[in-house]
Amino acid sequence: MTNTRKSHPLIKIMNHSFIDLPTPSNISAWWNFGSLLGVCLGLQILTGLFLAMHYTADTTTAFSSVTHICRDVNYGWLIRYMHANGASMFFIFLYFHIGRGIYYGSYTFMDTWNIGVLLLFAVMATAFMGYVLPWGQMSFWGATVITNLLSAIPYIGPTLVEWIWGGFSVDKATLTRFFAFHFILPFIITAMVMIHLLFLHETGSNNPSGMNSDSDKIPFHPYYTIKDILGVLFMMITLMSLVMFTPDLLGDPDNYTPANPLNTPPHIKPEWYFLFAYAILRSIPNKLGGVLALVFSILILMLFPILHSSKQRSMSFRPLSQCLMWVLVANLLILTWIGGQPVEHPFITIGQLASVTYFFTILILMPSTALMENKLLKW
């Protein structure tokens, strides 16, 4: 008789995905982030569900309901800060995961890569709407600034903004619909993750060498289940250290002031994980130009498979491309720093230079360097 895990219609799917899955024997810790993102998503849905039980999506009571969660609900503070800092962990892992994909050429799995970019957009939208829910100063003004960007769209812009607001400003209707979207999107993300994995399992995983590994595969369980559990352990240690010792380290103090439409904070800025994109948005003095640059700064990821000009898939054996990869990482760190600074000299100039360098590195330097390395192979 066949083993149940190989014959049962449902368990069979799990078996082919997490147990008997043939996996390259040489994948490094950079391949841990996929499973960590899955754990993060589960954690966010779970903590979010418990927060939603006590939260009220109304402008008059939203702020005090969050305060109530922290003060009066059993372990409410823990759930709230795990959710807030869990989002930060989610984005750290997302950026590492994407960075890994760029470094090792995983973007050549076009279907997996493109659904991944769509996932990034969905997670960013979810995080933005979640940041609005506590209805603090930065929640309100962040929502006002970011939704206002849509007014730059020619002809339909102003109407579109008022349609999203559900009125003539960010108000009760906006908060209610943002809560509805923030609740439903993680489930849509979960469905997209399943499609992401479906496409990945069609081709199998990439590996650090970038070469075909069909001749050297090992079962996912127990080798990589153990490795993933170790990753989760490190993640939980980091997350719980953040939550227990410095829960507000990554937040904005302005969000502890209830939303006031009559008082604008001196520096409106998003959470740290959006700062690089915010810096690119601000570096262009034209509204529509800034919005296009903002969207394209993420959408550019979809061009990686097209821009790939090297004969080798991975950067493991391409030292010049490796240097450029780290230039890109440094560039993004500079943009993140600039996004949190006020709009004044010298930050404006640094931001503009970093924004130009970001696009120039991806669109011109990386493909041309890869072509040069192809020539060096013959030399």
From Swiss-Prot:
Cofactor annotation comment:
Binds 2 heme b groups non-covalently.
State where heme b b562 binds.
H83, H182
Membrane topology (UniProt): Multi-pass membrane protein
Annotated a ubiquinone binding sites: H201
Q: What is the effect of changing T23A?
A: In strain: Isolate 1019
Q: Which InterPro entries match?
A: Cyt_b/b6_C (IPR005798), Cyt_b/b6_C_sf (IPR036150), Cyt_b/b6_N (IPR005797), Cytb/b6-like_sf (IPR027387), Cytochrome_b (IPR030689), Cytochrome_b_C_euk/bac (IPR048260), Cytochrome_b_N_euk/bac (IPR048259), Di-haem_cyt_TM (IPR016174)
In this chain, heme b b566 is annotated as bound at: H97, H196
Where found, per UniProt? Mitochondrion inner membrane
Q: GO CC annotation: what is one? A: respiratory chain complex III
Query: What's the cofactor?
Result: heme b
Q: Give the keywords, sorted.
A: Electron transport, Heme, Iron, Membrane, Metal-binding, Mitochondrion, Mitochondrion inner membrane, Respiratory chain, Transmembrane, Transmembrane helix, Transport, Ubiquinone
> Could you tell me which PROSITE patterns the record lists for this protein?
CYTB_CTER, CYTB_NTER
Q: Which GO molecular function annotations are given, in alphabetical order? A: metal ion binding; ubiquinol-cytochrome-c reductase activity
**Which Pfam family would be a valid example here?**
Cytochrom_B_C
Residue ranges annotated as transmembrane are 33-53, 77-98, 113-133, 178-198, 226-246, 288-308, 320-340, 347-367
One GO biological process this protein is involved in is: mitochondrial electron transport, ubiquinol to cytochrome c
> Anything further noted?
Heme 1 (or BL or b562) is low-potential and absorbs at about 562 nm, and heme 2 (or BH or b566) is high-potential and absorbs at about 566 nm.
Q: What does this protein do?
A: Component of the ubiquinol-cytochrome c reductase complex (complex III or cytochrome b-c1 complex) that is part of the mitochondrial respiratory chain. The b-c1 complex mediates electron transfer from ubiquinol to cytochrome c. Contributes to the generation of a proton gradient across the mitochondrial membrane that is then used for ATP synthesis.
Subunit composition? The cytochrome bc1 complex contains 11 subunits: 3 respiratory subunits (MT-CYB, CYC1 and UQCRFS1), 2 core proteins (UQCRC1 and UQCRC2) and 6 low-molecular weight proteins (UQCRH/QCR6, UQCRB/QCR7, UQCRQ/QCR8, UQCR10/QCR9, UQCR11/QCR10 and a cleavage product of UQCRFS1). This cytochrome bc1 complex then forms a dimer.
What's this protein's family per the entry?
Belongs to the cytochrome b family.
Q: What is this protein called?
A: Cytochrome b
Q: Which organism is it from?
A: Ctenomys maulinus (Maule tuco-tuco)
